[in-house]
Regions:
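Short, small-residue-biased leader/transition segments that mark boundaries at the very start
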Residues: 1-15
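Exposed loop/turn and edge beta-strand positions of beta-sandwich/beta-sheet ligand-binding modules
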Residues: 5, 9, 110, 194
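Short, flexible active-site loop motifs that bind/organize anionic cofactors or intermediates
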Residues: 5, 73-76, 195, 245
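Short, conserved micro-motifs enriched in small and acidic residues
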Residues: 5-6, 80-81, 203
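A short, polar/charged loop/turn motif at coil->beta-strand junctions and beta-hairpin connectors
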Residues: 9, 27, 184-186
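SAM-dependent transferase fold signal centered on methyltransferase-like domains
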Residues: 11-173, 210, 214-221, 292-306
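Rossmann-like S-adenosyl-L-methionine
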Residues: 13, 138-306
Length: 306
C-alpha cells in the first residue's frame, strides 16, 4: 500500500479508505503515493450525457451529485482541451436541426451520451455518439463538422434503446474513419475501440506499470498471470521481460482486442483467455497436470487489477 505524502491534495480525512490504518502507522509501513506533476487535462477518456436544463435548453456536462440533473459544462479541467470543441460542435448541430436529447423519464429523444477518447502520444481522437435510435438524421452533416477537428480519427455510433443507466450499447457502427484509435504505453502500441477498457490516465499508468515491472523483477524465464487483463495493457508491458504471460478477462471483446494488440506489437509470448479468473486459472492447472504427468504448473508472478 501507499500513503498520501505530507503535502498533498488528499489529506487523511478518511483513514478507513487506507484499510483503517492510522496516519502514524501508515508513515511507517507505506511509501508515499506517486503523484502527478500537473494533475490537469490528463484523462484520455470522457463521457458526457445530454439533456435539458430547467429552462428547456439542451445542455451537456456532468450529473449533479446523487442525481441525473445535468450541470452544464463543456470545459472540464480533467479532460483534454479538445473535448470542448467537440461538445460545442455537437450542441450546435443539435440546435440547427432541432434534435432532442434523450429524456430518461419519457424514454424519448435521440442523443444520450458522447464518448470521447484521445491518444496522448498519437494525438488521435475518437467520438462515439450513443443514441436512442438506429441512426442520426442529417448524420453526414455532423460527420462533416467533426471531421474538421484536428486529430479526428474515428467517428462511431452505439445504439442504446434500453431503459438503463448503462451508457454504451452492446455494439457500435463506424460512421467515418477507423473503428479504433491507437496509443502507446512505453513502447507498446494499443488499439482502443469504443468498448475497450484502457487506463484513463496515461502519465500515471506508465509510472504504475514501471513500478509493477520493478517489483516483479523479471529475469526472462518467468511465467506471469495477469488477472482481469482488459485489452492486455499490463500483460503486453510485462511480456517484454517475461518468458510467458497469460491474461484472463471475462469480456470477450476485450480479449479480442488483447490478441490484436499482441499481434501488432509482434509479441508471441502472451496468451489470453476469456472467462472468470477464479475458473480459468484452476482449469489451466488441472489441464496442465493431465498433459504433463508428474509436473505441476506454477506462476512466478500474478498481477491482479480487478
Amino acid at each position: 500500500i501507499r500513503r498520501p505524502p505530507r503535502s498533498t491534495l488528499f489529506p487523511y480525512t478518511t483513514p478507513f479508505r487506507s484499510g483503517g490504518f492510522s496516519p502514524e502507522l501508515l508513515e511507517k509501513i507505506a511509501d508515499p503515493i506517486v503523484g502527478m506533476e500537473i494533475p490537469f487535462h490528463y484523462r484520455n477518456k470522457a463521457q458526457f450525457p445530454f439533456g435539458k436544463d430547467k429552462n428547456g435548453v439542451t445542455v451537456t456536462g456532468f450529473y449533479a451529485g446523487r442525481t441525473h440533473d445535468i450541470i452544464a459544462n463543456t470545459d472540464c479541467a480533467l479532460g483534454v482541451e479538445q473535448n470542448q470543441e467537440i461538445l460545442e460542435t455537437i450542441l450546435s448541430f443539435m440546435e440547427q436541426y432541432q434534435m432532442e436529447p434523450y429524456d430518461e423519464k419519457t424514454g424519448k429523444g435521440l442523443l444520450r451520451h458522447v464518448l470521447i477518447r484521445y491518444g496522448f502520444t498519437t494525438k488521435e481522437i475518437m467520438v462515439c455518439l450513443v443514441i436512442n435510435a438506429k441512426k442520426i438524421p442529417h448524420c453526414e452533416k455532423l460527420v462533416e463538422l467533426l471531421q474538421k477537428i484536428e486529430g479526428m480519427t474515428s467517428i462511431t455510433i452505439s445504439v442504446n434503446q434500453k431503459n438503463t443507466n448503462v451508457i454504451m450499447g452492446d455494439s457500435y457502427e463506424v460512421l467515418w474513419g477507423q473503428a479504433f484509435i491507437t496509443d502507446y504505453i512505453g513502447e507498446i502500441k494499443y488499439q482502443i475501440s469504443p468498448l475497450s477498457f484502457f487506463q484513463v490516465n496515461p502519465v500515471q499508468t506508465e509510472k504504475l506499470y514501471g513500478l509493477a515491472l520493478e517489483y516483479a523483477d523479471l529475469k526472462g524465464d518467468e511465467t506471469v498471470w495477469d488477472l482481469y487483463c482488459g485489452i492486455g495493457t499490463i500483460s503486453l508491458f510485462l511480456a517484454q521481460k517475461a518468458k510467458q504471460v497469460y491474461g484472463v478477462e471475462i469480456i470477450p471483446q476485450a480479449i479480442e482486442d488483447a490478441r490484436k494488440n499482441a499481434q501488432i506489437n509482434g509479441i508471441e509470448n502472451a496468451k489470453f483467455y476469456v472467462g472468470k479468473a477464479e475458473e480459468v486459472l484452476p482449469g489451466y492447472y488441472a489441464d496442465y497436470a493431465k498433459a504433463h504427468p508428474g509436473e505441476q504448473a506454477h506462476a512466478d508472478v500474478i498481477v491482479v487489477d480487478p
